[in-house]
Amino acid sequence: GAGDRGDAAMVAYGASRYALSKGDKAEAEKLWPLIEWCLEYCRRNLNESGVVASDADELENRFPAGKANLCTSSLYYDALISAGYLGKDLGKPVAAYARQATALKKNIDRYFGGTVEGFDTYKYYEGNDVLRSWICIPLTVGIQDRKDATIQALFSPRLWTENGLLTQAGSETFWDRSTLYALRGVYACGETEKATDYLRFYSSQRLLGEHVPYAIEAWPEGNQRHLSAESGLYCRIITEGMFGIRPTGLNSFVFTPRLPQEWDHMNLRKICAFNQVFDIEVKRLGDQLQVAVIADGKTISNRKIKEGENIRIKF
């Protein structure tokens, strides 16, 4: 195959978030050994700079990824945080994961942070001097140290096109997955208006344009075929970006709603997560937001918050 694409980081990231969101303790117990193994695999593959070594990424050498890439370490970072939440609810010893996450966050900035094409953002790998679309990935895992320059770079003419983000500046190749991650990350950073403008543009192009009605995988490879994973990533722009939902336990989450200025309300209904079915309703009240969480006809929380404030929910 393509070698180590950072699969262990991907599995740990996805499985821990899935287990938390599902809210099924028995299923989480079954997944725990897999998550633990993947985290340990990543730890054993840390290089001398404290980031994860991998000889490829999900693009499988279509574009250079060096000996350690930003994507793998960012996913590992988020996986450590999610595993900390999950392990706590399962009664597992998880203190080491928090320490490892703190160290990794510093190492990511030290190793990957730098100026690329005039933007104080991230090198995708050591020696990378051309902007890459995956500089968006830290924004999706709560790493915002370089958010301003990173967002400027993402939406600069070097990367942004009528088809979303180019995989690499100067190329003609685009894979929708990085555009979909980027839009989620820009919402997560609180750049709501910018994210909404570009989400509207992307949606009219992809979902309502000539090649419809789904997000696509790539071009020119595969001739813009539709894959379900990209449509899932589109949904995550809404759930994790616009509504800012972040699981913190098998029956708890934190969320930060990002209501676009020209909207007076937004609702997300019949959310099936944390072993519940619930709604989130957000209304604009002057310079504040009225935010309600309703499950089984009962109001779990109803609060006024400032823009950018988060709300913690425990069922």
Task: Briefly describe each language-model feature range.
Residues A8, E29, P33-E36, E40, ...:
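Active-site core of glycosidic bond-cleaving carbohydrate-active enzymes
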Residues N107-F112:
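Short amphipathic coiled-coil heptad-repeat segments
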